[in-house]
Amino acid sequence: MRAVVQRVISSKVEVDGKVIGSIGKGLNVLLGISKEDTEEDIKYLKEKIINLRIFEDENEKLNKSLLDIGGDIIIVSQFTLYGDCRKGRRPSFIEALGGEEAYILYNKFIESIKKEVNNVATGEFGADMKVYIENDGPVTILLDSKKTF
């Protein structure tokens, strides 16, 4: 399971011109799910994301987590995080989990976050979305539950 985690001032997702999810200060998470992912990957990534110390304290040091600041989180599915561009010029998405199986893991991830964070918004799985991200910093972290980077 992979995530692009961005510290944001605000973020929102639109589908067909309608806002379906929005947050204030917190994290925008683009989430990719692979064929190898299990509930252990959900647990690992959830703990890592909500406890990442990427918010500034009173001394402007990155010492506070999403939980520490009581921030919001928006989670957007993005299978393209498993795009393999090593051969040719068109990405291969063969490692990405698709369909119903990915949808189930995506929802389990969201539910695990909701147990820890008060304001959780999401995109729409499988939809063509417009994602608006007002970065703060910018601070962007790449995470992989298999620890490949």
Curated annotation (Swiss-Prot):
The signal peptide, as residue positions, is none
Single GO biological process annotation from the record: D-amino acid catabolic process
Q: Which reaction does it catalyse?
A: glycyl-tRNA(Ala) + H2O = tRNA(Ala) + glycine + H(+); a D-aminoacyl-tRNA + H2O = a tRNA + a D-alpha-amino acid + H(+)
Give GO cellular component annotations, separated by semicolons: cytoplasm
Listed EC numbers: 3.1.1.96
* Enzyme superclass (EC): hydrolase
Concerning InterPro entries, the annotation shows:
Daa-tRNA_deacyls_DTD, DTD-like_sf
A GO molecular function for this record? tRNA binding
What the entry lists under SUPFAM superfamilies is as follows: DTD-like (SSF69500)
Q: What does this protein do?
A: An aminoacyl-tRNA editing enzyme that deacylates mischarged D-aminoacyl-tRNAs. Also deacylates mischarged glycyl-tRNA(Ala), protecting cells against glycine mischarging by AlaRS. Acts via tRNA-based rather than protein-based catalysis; rejects L-amino acids rather than detecting D-amino acids in the active site. By recycling D-aminoacyl-tRNA to D-amino acids and free tRNA molecules, this enzyme counteracts the toxicity associated with the formation of D-aminoacyl-tRNA entities in vivo and helps enforce protein L-homochirality.
**Protein's name according to its UniProt entry:** D-aminoacyl-tRNA deacylase
Source organism: Clostridium botulinum (strain Loch Maree / Type A3)
